[in-house]
């Protein structure tokens, strides 16, 4: 039997649109990556606590919760391309507003701008994530989304690298955001003038069942939503306080820690996503997810109880394990949505609000206990649930 092609389906070749959409993954990876450097930067610049600085994450990830359903409505009414363009425009406007923001120099104004950027990122992710899953054979959906997310991983590397070297060197915060804003709006202009396919028939060809008629699938989708919520909570919490942890427990400077985050943590994150897209051609996605959940659980436990070089190595292992989690959980959960893919995508994107919750809780724990390490018990619990979700898929044919 011929193996299904990753980019061909029903006589159509979706390679070119796949490459175009995948390039967008870098943009929001960069936006999230530089956000993690903003956290300690704002702590120093505005002399605020860890829990207060976590409002930066709360603004961006809170936007995912508020904007996901409107973004889904835009996609259902006008298609994926309009959803992407809307996201790029909001992203670009929010980034360019950092120019007057640097003159106003108010923490809360920056939080507002990050909320606008978060709304743009929501539209981008709500459009692009499900779009990659239908640009080819359904059986290769997990491989495609992991390959796309590999570019997202590069953005996560470049973000803290650029942000850390500029912000901790005293460079005006408006400079990196202004450059990103100009680039993003230019991409929006280009996309507004080209035509992209909308393979809605691919969704309809997969199944004629309605998700409401399958209570078991509704429960499975709900578990997928919870798992994605906890993953984003864990990832954001880890990213937000890596630099603080490195300074306190590993005794390295913030600028050096940002390099470790960019090249070590995010470098392995990128490699893991790239390798994951290939491995899932041969190994069931749920098994890869289970292995990564075990790795992240053990690594986080080491981060909590140890310090020094061992905990730094554990952090690197943690980033490697995290790499395939978001796209794999997203794609597995989307399988339980039947024909309701666009609505399901909006609901899944809403779960990214988990990123607004964990940093605040972890910041509060760190401020009250005086230990950043203890706060990492929060992502530890999250990784345990992710392992349970992977096990729950063992009876589901993949």
Sequence positions of predicted segments:
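Cytoplasmic helix-loop-helix junction between adjacent transmembrane helices
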Residues: 111-150
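Central cavity-lining transmembrane alpha-helices of secondary-active solute carriers
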Residues: 58-73, 263-275
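Helix-loop-helix hairpin linking two adjacent transmembrane segments in secondary transporters
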Residues: 104, 144, 148-199
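Extracytoplasmic
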Residues: 16-44, 48, 128-129, 238-243
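Hydrophobic core of transmembrane alpha-helices in multi-pass small-molecule transporters
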Residues: 107-124, 310-325
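Extracytoplasmic gate region of multi-pass secondary transporters
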Residues: 35-39, 216-263, 267
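Intracellular juxtamembrane helix-capping segments at the cytosolic ends
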Residues: 123-137, 323-338
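C-terminal ends and interior cores of transmembrane alpha-helices
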Residues: 89-104, 294-307
